[in-house]
UniProtKB/Swiss-Prot annotation:
The keyword Lyase does not apply. GO terms for molecular function: magnesium ion binding; manganese ion binding; phosphopentomutase activity. It is found in: Cytoplasm. Binds 2 manganese ions. Gene3D superfamilies: Alkaline Phosphatase, subunit A, Phosphopentomutase. Mn(2+) 1 binds at D13, D339, H340. The gene is deoB. This is Phosphopentomutase. Keywords: Cytoplasm, Isomerase, Manganese, Metal-binding.
Length: 403
């Protein structure tokens, strides 16, 4: 019999809690990640007021230097620790796949200086359309169409851009490049990015409509992902007939593998929390696992190195945390974590190699405290242990520590 009937895992995308032991093997604009500390530097430079996460034990997580404005609780309501990454990457897919039990020894490729000419030329030859070279770099999806949409409307050229993650995105005005054509080009791009030196996690079709100065991305987005290279705990749950619910970009990250209820993309963190609350309230969701990603911390503030915005985003989540707790049933378990760091005070604009926090709360808890420092995959091992299924490749359960 399961200790918890339902487990809700919420990933605060990029909310790291200090440089990992191997952080100096990873760099940002030539600067090793060894001094990165997303939560620590936000707390130190702009202040951080997150009383609801603090109540569970955020300030109790072991650190060389305590969080400046998040005090340790003498009697927290839950359990806390930090987790180290094993895999050789610091991107979203690597982090999430490891959380679900995989060890990624061959990381995906990211293109901070844009895609190589060879790829762009192949896409041009296949599509019969030129590619706008100036857009070929990490770009905000809304900014790139504002900047190059008018030109695309005049010339029919393709807008191809990337991000901090291993993705190739193609933006196309629906009146200029029909959806069928856009999808066909994306399928070709997928076929040429399945191995090094351009092993990409996703190809994303990004259609939009409107006039210059008033462009809007449509719901006709299409993701062409790769499935995890081995079964994750999501697959193990699915095979055992245990419901899995995905909120936000989780379904895309796993290419649907092991997920039988996709609750859709988030328009914002707030919308994602609304969707999570709706999911938790489903009468038919009596037993199972929900997996939510809230990406605004990373996409809107981490990469843009906006510490004030990042702090405010954390405040907004913390203010809504009581709603999530109120929606829990007696035998529910809530796990709050991250997938990598993205220190908004650091060099460059890339993710940072960090520990991730882990907060655990349940109305059924009788105890509290600090769990020994572990690894990302311990989360999925704990989920597997709870529901009586096998773990994936790696991970040690901490279920017996939650009392």
């Amino acid at each position: 019999m399961s200790k918890f009937n339902r487990i809700h895992l919420v990933v605060l995308d990029s909310v790291g809690i200090g440089a990992a032991p191997d952080a100096n093997n990873f760099v940002n604009a030539g600067v090793p990640d060894g001094a990165s500390d997303t939560l620590g530097h936000i707390s130190k430079t702009v202040g951080l007021n997150v009383p609801n996460m603090a109540k569970i034990g955020l300030g109790n997580i072991p650190r060389e230097t305590p969080l400046k404005t998040v005090a340790a609780e003498s009697n927290p309501t839950g359990y806390a620790t930090k987790l180290e990454e094993v895999s050789l990457g610091k991107d979203t897919m690597t982090g999430h796949w490891e959380i679900m039990g995989l060890n990624i020894t061959e990381p995906f490729d990211t293109f901070w200086n844009g895609f190589p000419e060879e790829i762009l030329t192949k896409i041009e030859e296949f599509s019969g359309r030129k590619v706008i070279r100036e857009a070929n770099k990490p770009y905000s999806g809304t900014a790139v169409i504002d900047d190059f949409g008018p030109r695309q409307m005049e010339t029919g050229e393709l807008i191809i851009y990337t991000s901090a993650d291993p993705v190739l995105q193609i933006a196309a005005h629906e009146d200029i490049i029909p959806l069928d054509e856009l999808y066909r080009i994306c399928e070709y791009a997928r076929s040429i990015t399945l191995e090094r030196p351009a092993l990409l996690g996703r190809i994303i079709a990004r259609p939009y409509v409107g006039e210059p100065g008033n462009f809007t991305r449509t719901a006709n987005r299409r993701d062409l992902a790769v499935s995890p290279f081995a079964p994750t705990v999501l697959d193990k749950l699915n095979e055992a007939g245990i419901d899995t619910y995905a909120v936000g970009k989780i379904n895309d990250i796993f290419n649907g593998a092991g997920i039988n209820h996709d609750m859709g993309h988030n328009k914002s963190n707030s919308h994602g929390i609304d969707t999570l609350l709706k999911t938790m309230g489903l009468a038919e969701f009596e037993k199972g696992f929900s997996f939510t990603n809230l990406v605004d911390f990373d996409a809107l503030y981490g990469h843009r190195r906006n510490a004030h915005g990042y702090r405010d985003c954390l405040h907004e989540f913390d203010e809504r945390l009581p709603e999530i707790i109120a929606a829990m049933r007696e035998n529910d378990l809530l796990l709050i974590t991250a997938d990598h760091g993205n220190d908004p005070t650091y060099a460059g604009t890339d993710h940072t190699r960090e520990y991730i926090p882990l907060l655990a709360y349940s109305p059924a808890f009788k105890g509290n405290g600090v769990i020994p420092v572990g690894h990302f995959a311990d989360i999925s091992a704990t989920v597997a242990d709870n529901f009586g299924v096998e773990t994936a490749m790696i991970g040690e359960s901490f279920l017996d520590k939650l009392v």
